Curated annotation (Swiss-Prot):
Its EC number is 3.4.11.18. PROSITE patterns: MAP_2 (PS01202). Its main location: cytoplasm. The keyword Hydrolase applies. It is an enzyme of class 3 (hydrolase). CDD domains: MetAP2 (cd01088). The keyword Nucleotide-binding does not apply. One of its GO terms (cellular component) is cytoplasm. It catalyses: Release of N-terminal amino acids, preferentially methionine, from peptides and arylamides. This is Methionine aminopeptidase 2. Belongs to the peptidase M24A family. Methionine aminopeptidase eukaryotic type 2 subfamily.
Amino acid sequence: MSTNSSNPNEVMEKVQDLKIDDSKPKVDSEEQPEAESDGESATDGAQKKKKKKKSKKKKKITAIDNSYPDGVFPEGEWQEYPLDVNSYRTTSEEKRYLDRQQNNHWQDFRKGAEIHRRVRHKAQSSIRPGMNMTEIADLIENSVRSYANNDHTLKAGIGFPTGLSLNHVAAHYTPNAGDKTVLNYEDVMKVDIGVHVNGHIVDSAFTLTFDDKYDSLLKAVKEATNTGVKEAGIDVRLNDIGEAIQEVMESYEMELNGKTYPIKCIRNLNGHNIGDYLIHSGKTVPIVPNGDMTKMEEGETFAIETFGSTGNGYVLPQGECSHYAKNPGTDDIVVPGDKAKSLLNVINENFGTLPWCRRYLDRLGQDKYLLALNQLVRAGIVQDYPPIVDIKGSYTAQFEHTILLHPHKKEVVSRGDDY
């Protein structure tokens, strides 16, 4: 997700059409224990013993490779390109041949997407009101690590910090150490998960709610994202995608507490193309028309994401920063101080140019690193990404998919049964 730099006068603060059953989980049935051999009858012994609940064993997550030993992973959803000028691509044998030459490249994305689907299924079935943000982040990220069978290495694993932005916070929030924020029944939480394999990042997000009063907000954003996916393709102008997205998104409104709110595109948030080990790589995909006549090209990978809001439809940075990433092309910059050099070595060895958060540094045993981290930010070696917010009291939602522009068709690689 990328942001625009324009800044209007309004002051303000990353979806799935999902309903989670917040009722209490079913209690496992109880069984009668066997009587002890102390001369008592089985009945007497059973009456004196307390009934014991069956212990429910948690299913252990195993590496995704175990499910696909041949290394061939499920394909995503195939869509034909929207422009008539591209109709020949569907039947072109030459284009199919070119696509096969990049098979390993595509398999990395498909592996990451299958991990993503399994992780978000676990998240959707496990997250409940009352959990704190660190519990939720750990649930998701530890699942990614287990399926990838890598502990956040540069080979495969977490593509970026899990976004868990609540309500008017649209993106770039994940808990830092000590954060006590708890998920409430009336919250609107954007769940943004990244998985990478050999630097090929699958970026996909949904919004989780428990109260059906947000249904129209979620539907608006989900339909807008699907519109962006449908309109995207080789030779399509970025401006035209934004125009189509806005038309769908802003045809919706939401009633809340007796008041009707128009649902607005958050106009300074965009989709983006994805590079190797780079979550943002050059082009941005607007969600409103912006005059950008740049075209999508064959072989590119894009994250098509849209954000809707009941607020001003514009976000600004606010709050404690948790997200960071090393800027590419900064190896020649002089590193300010020994502690900053040491921290930079840790960043290079564990993340490269993939985004990361403070919790990941904590997990690696780093401590007292904030001064050195701020020095790297000021030197331009590391980029900080603070939370971005719409006006307080508003609600924001997000849906996102990763698409692959094959020579003959596009593949919505992150598509699942859920969204």
